[in-house]
Amino acid sequence: MTIWEAFFLGLIQGVTEFLPISSSGHLELAQYFLGFEKLQSYVLFNLICHLGTLGSILYMFLPQIKQSLITERNHIFHIILGTLPLFPLVLILKPIKATFDQPQYLGLCFLFSAALLFSGVYFRLQMQKKHSLRDCLTIGLFQAVAVLPGISRSGATISAARLLGWDKQDAIQFSFLLAIPAILGGTFLEIWQFLKLPASEIPPIEIGQFLTGFITSFMIGCASLWAVIQMMTQDKWVYFAWYCLFIGIATTLYFQM
């Protein structure tokens, strides 16, 4: 992997992790066309990029995180509750994920993302001030489904919150705070699986490329978070739905040819 390829993949991760268009789906496509999808070194590189975007959340939402830890600890309980469905559902969906990891199925997942985004824009319950424990669990279920590449985690969770009647600000904040344990847990699980590989299959660590991917995904991730907040508050969320619909159709047609 060259420095420029590392920059390009870090850019994709940073742009797509928080925009509701699926970072995993776009990385799958990019690595397919670059010929990287089967190489262990790029599995590890993806993990580094995910840690970069995790850093973006911690940086951009630091005031809210401090507030949750000091004065509004019920928020922490809501995050834990929303994370609970992730573990059993990931185990259930793991065999399905192995199938949907194939590029030819990405289009279907992008189309599912589009349907979620459209539903979050056009179909909502009456606005509610308080958020129930059931709401947190429901949003957590939507997050678990997003383990499939092509289904956006932020798109699924924000759309679920909007469907349940949450206002825009609460939906965005809960979605991205919910991402912290999800990304951490997923990253450590992947690292654990990676370390169990035979020594002969563990690739050399490319420090320059990994640093490039991490820094790029962090910086672009911060910009993407800002863009998501602006797009949501300005009622431009539906643009992402149309984008997922387009790329879903294009991907499906390409791999059926």
UniProtKB/Swiss-Prot annotation:
One of its GO terms (molecular function) is undecaprenyl-diphosphatase activity. InterPro entries: UppP (IPR003824). The keyword Transmembrane helix applies. GO terms for biological process: cell wall organization; peptidoglycan biosynthetic process; regulation of cell shape; response to antibiotic. GO terms for cellular component: plasma membrane. Keywords: Antibiotic resistance, Cell inner membrane, Cell membrane, Cell shape, Cell wall biogenesis/degradation, Hydrolase, Membrane, Peptidoglycan synthesis, Transmembrane, Transmembrane helix. It catalyses: di-trans,octa-cis-undecaprenyl diphosphate + H2O = di-trans,octa-cis-undecaprenyl phosphate + phosphate + H(+). It comes from the Bacteria. It is a multi-pass membrane protein. Its EC number is 3.6.1.27. It is found in: Cell inner membrane. The chain crosses the membrane at residues 42-62, 76-96, 103-123, 136-156, 172-192, 209-229, 237-257. It is an enzyme of class 3 (hydrolase). Bacitracin is thought to be involved in the inhibition of peptidoglycan synthesis by sequestering undecaprenyl diphosphate, thereby reducing the pool of lipid carrier available. Catalyzes the dephosphorylation of undecaprenyl diphosphate (UPP). Confers resistance to bacitracin. Belongs to the UppP family. This is Undecaprenyl-diphosphatase. It comes from Protochlamydia amoebophila (strain UWE25).
